[in-house]
Amino acid sequence: QDSCQASTFSVIIVRGSVASWRVRPDMPEQRAAMTIQELRAIAVPVIVRTTEDMLSLVPDTLREAARDHDVILTSGGVSVGEADFTRDVMARLGDVLFWKLAMKPGRPFAFGRIGGHDGAWLFGLPGNPVATMIAFYQFARPALLRLAGVDPVAPPPLLDARSSGAIRKAPGRTEFLRGVLFEADGHWQVRSTGAQGSGILSSMADANCFIVLGPDQTSVTAGEPVAVQLFDGLV
C-alpha cells in the first residue's frame, strides 16, 4: 500500500523521500511522518506538498494525492476556523464518513474518501502536534495495518496502575493524558507529565504511556486506579 501525507501548514518541505525532507521540529507533520516511517514495512510514505491555508490550493493537492495513492494523511484544516477547508473539500471531492471525536486531545478529526467508492482513504488529523500524534496512534495506525492485510489488528492493551496524583476530568469524552508509568512499593503507579496542552510536545517526549480516562469517568483522586496504554509497541 502507498500512503502520502499533506500538511495545511505553511512550512518548507523538500519533496522526495522521507529521509530528505525538512520541517520545523515543533510542527505536527514531522511527528506524523515519523510514525508513518515506523510502518515502512507496510506502506510507502510520500510527502506530497505543504499547502498554505488557502481554499484554492487544497482541492488540487488532494486530487493529486488521491490519483496515485491509497491513503492520504493531512494535518490541520479540519476544525471550524476560517482557514479550515479540508473537511469541506473532502465532502466536495468524495465522502466524509465522520467528523469530530468525543476525545481530548484530537477532537477535530475527519475520515472519508477522495474520489468515490474506489478512491483514496483520507485521515484528516488535527493540527496541534500532540493531537496529531494521538489521533494517528489511535485511529490511522490500526487502519493502515488493517489495509495492509493484518487481521485481526489487536488494540493496544490497557494496564491498571494507581494514579500518583489527582487528575481533573469532566465526563462526556475520552481523554488521553501523557504519563510516566513507574513501580513503587510493589505497585505500578503513573503520574502525568505536567501541562497537557495539545501543543506541548514535551508532554509526549517525557512520557512512556497514555493515561486513558473513559467517557463516563470523572476526576481521579491520588491512589485511584486508572487505565494505562504503554508506548512500547505503539509509538
Language-model-detected regions and their locations in the chain:
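Flexible glycine/proline-rich
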Residues: 91-235
